[in-house]
């Protein structure tokens, strides 16, 4: 993105405040463009009126991310990689979190192939209000047989998740593309020996392609430039991922050099980067648990330092869970705390005799409390108070959680402690105990101080509920 101020974007808008984009003013729409929650094409006058054609083209150029954004796959499960504008998250945010693809081979029998593919497709981990997923499958041609590879690709494509077709043999890649040409797979990879044939395949089938040059940045840049000049736009860079020692250090340094150059304006290398933690299994580690451990460590290294897409092997929970959790954490937008809606929630099927509690609307706090309650079979009413997405202790200390805020939250939720429950009692977090007296005055209700940690709620309820 070449501009970072709404005022700069505003110059390219119609400046009529017509409201057709859904915003009250053109300046409000300009703000959406800068924070990337809106697109120039969402302004109807820019698109429809010929006099704005040049402004639209220039605005799209200025707003385009420094690192090219690429889509892999089709439909609801399609994934985007790249699209970043900064080297450090605190300067804006990182976009399009690292995508995790897990390998299968064309020598696996059909049952094992489908079982592993479906394991990737069906993976779900609920975390802070959302499901974390694995992103796709990388089909490796071990046989080097076009027919076998095509058969494997066909079976995997039926599951409906994004694919990477992996072979250095253009004939094998072509066979795979023939059966998956409408699935927009990523093809891996073009190198100094096969670049011409693989480039032709990328153009013929209009699919994204990986260019690969292990520990040779000049060669990698030359390949990327050659492909771009040939009209191939969707390019992914593979600078090589060595699993240990000096090679791993060099790989890490190469990732830094590539991303820094791309962000600083070198358009010839401003593409997403592929990491290959799967090489941990080629490092001579005989114990599969140790190999998976090292693969996960490598995945962590390159998630933190600009790996946009990865190919991995282990599907054990001790490997996949750290991988997806770290990616989710690194790519959380620091500009906006993760928050739930401020309202009254039901835990189980509460009635007029059920206890009433509140916590803040910081998502991690809310879901921790909700989980501790539901997992212990505690049926209750749980109010999320709007604290701008800040946790209980910090919000109570900083003034975002006050008796007035809690009273307002009850009123906005439409919940009346005197009418909707028989006990006229509310339980507050132990970390907000200072609010007890003020809340009793504001709410006209009995206020009980709960434990400091929601994990202690079951024991607290045994001793203190129902109130005497």
UniProtKB/Swiss-Prot annotation:
Pathway: One-carbon metabolism; methanogenesis from acetate. Pfam families: CdhD, FeS. It comes from the Archaea. GO terms for molecular function: 4 iron, 4 sulfur cluster binding; anaerobic carbon-monoxide dehydrogenase activity; iron ion binding; methyltransferase activity. It catalyses: 5,6,7,8-tetrahydrosarcinapterin + methyl-Co(III)-[corrinoid Fe-S protein] = 5-methyltetrahydrosarcinapterin + Co(I)-[corrinoid Fe-S protein] + H(+). [4Fe-4S] cluster binds at residues 18, 21, 26, 43. GO terms for biological process: acetyl-CoA catabolic process; methanogenesis, from acetate; methylation. Its EC number is 2.1.1.245. Binds 1 [4Fe-4S] cluster. InterPro entries: 4Fe-4S_dom, Ac-CoA_synth_d_su_TIM-brl, ACDS_complex_subunit, AcylCoA_decarb/synth_gsu, AcylCoA_decarb/synth_gsu_arc, Dihydropteroate_synth-like_sf. Residues 1-60 form the 4Fe-4S domain. Keywords: 4Fe-4S, Cobalt, Iron, Iron-sulfur, Metal-binding, Methanogenesis, Methyltransferase, Transferase. Its cofactor is corrinoid; [4Fe-4S] cluster. Heterodimer of delta and gamma chains. The ACDS complex is made up of alpha, epsilon, beta, gamma and delta chains with a probable stoichiometry of (alpha(2)epsilon(2))(4)-beta(8)-(gamma(1)delta(1))(8). PANTHER family: ACETYL-COA DECARBONYLASE_SYNTHASE COMPLEX SUBUNIT GAMMA, PTHR36214. Part of a complex that catalyzes the reversible cleavage of acetyl-CoA, allowing growth on acetate as sole source of carbon and energy. This is Acetyl-CoA decarbonylase/synthase complex subunit gamma 2. It comes from Methanosarcina thermophila. The gene is cdhE2.
